[in-house]
Amino acid sequence: MNHPLRIHEIRLPWKHTPMNPHYAFVREQIVALLNELGLCEEEKEKDRRDGVITMGAYIYPDAGPNELLFGTLFVLWLFFFDDIFDESKFLKGESSQAAERTLQMFRTRQPPVNATTGLSMGIVQLEKLLLRIFKMAKDLAHGPYVISRFMETCEFYITEGAIPMDKFRFRKELPKLDEYLAVRTIDGAGEACIVCSEIVAHLALPEHIINEPRIKRMREITGQQIVYSNDIYSYHREKIHNNSVNALNIRCLTKSFNDALTDQINQVNEWVLEFEALKNSLYESTLWENNLDVYITGMENTMMGCKIWSESCTRYDLNALLHITPDKNEFPER
């Protein structure tokens, strides 16, 4: 039976990435570190932790143990940081304060200068985790240029993605679709994840390659594919948590749910076709070489890893979600 959200129609033209053979070792290391920091003490947080560790093993299938540990910890940090805005256990003032402190950390690469008095322990613990990630990035990155881009893309994610997305949630009306996509793409932290993949692969691509228009567009597509697909996978979960800021909900302002879903899936698949066309264009150009191949493969693995995780994790398990939702009419026609 096909999935009601038609996730089987979201297509990626690459083989499923195999799970990294260092998964078990890295999981053990991460569980110990998070226990040391006092993170992931609740059952739902442990479930999230285990899911993201699995996702990391698919995003970085060829990484060594230390590289996989770094890449997975960064993805975990992104999920934890996003929870500061999403979870009710953090107050509005706390989320703003946490964002400012984290921005300061990315700009200075040091702990925040302000005291932690009055902050939730979860925020303090998250800052300690980020400092561990900084140290690992410095040890693994192939040169200061890559580290600088890593910090800059993370800062960009917060200022132009996470904070504006949080503001959307407090608006009386949903944003326009184009406005939403521009912010949501950055909120997905795709650019930062791609630089993370560079660090994992020990790459140091020159600036003219990083800024080549086709490559810039491929990075953007990677981010767009991930977040628009996620808006499909997470649709029911967001309904349960009364979060209407989702591309499908915005499309449903003018279309039926099924038509909105069709448009969303078609858009995601069109982006992937564009990605492949750009890749083929680069392959036929004088720019193509092994490091660029590895770099692009990192983007493909990021999209595929997110897909594998989204279609298997309990977070988006449709049967479980429908079991707890009070709304039996899951597919309203408008």
UniProtKB/Swiss-Prot annotation:
It comes from the Eukaryota. The keyword Lyase applies. Mg(2+) 2 binds at D86. Gene3D superfamilies: Farnesyl Diphosphate Synthase (1.10.600.10). Mg(2+) 1 binds at D82, D86. A motif (D(D/E)XX(D/E) motif) lies at residues 82-86. GO terms for molecular function: (-)-E-beta-caryophyllene synthase activity; metal ion binding; myrcene synthase activity. Mg(2+) 3 binds at N230, S234, E238. InterPro entries: Isoprenoid_synthase_dom_sf, Terpene_cyclase-like_2. One of its GO terms (biological process) is terpene biosynthetic process. A motif (NSE motif) lies at residues 230-238. A motif (WxxxxxRY motif) lies at residues 309-316. Its EC number is 4.2.3.-, 4.2.3.125, 4.2.3.126, 4.2.3.15. Keywords: Lyase, Magnesium, Metal-binding. The 2 conserved active-site motifs D(D/E)XX(D/E) and NSE are required for coordinating the divalent metal ions that stabilize the PPi moiety of the substrate. The C-terminal WxxxxxRY motif is frequently found in terpene synthases and is important to guide product formation. Belongs to the terpene synthase family. Terpene synthase that catalyzes the cyclization of farnesyl diphosphate (FPP) into a mixture of sesquiterpenes with gamma-muurolene as the most abundant compound and (-)-beta-caryophyllene, alpha-muurolene, and 4 unidentified sesquiterpenes as minor compoundss. TPS1 also shows monoterpene synthase activity and can also use geranyl diphosphate (GPP) as a substrate to convert it into a mixture of cyclic and acyclic monoterpenes, including myrcene and linalool. This is Terpene synthase 1. It comes from Physarum polycephalum (Slime mold).
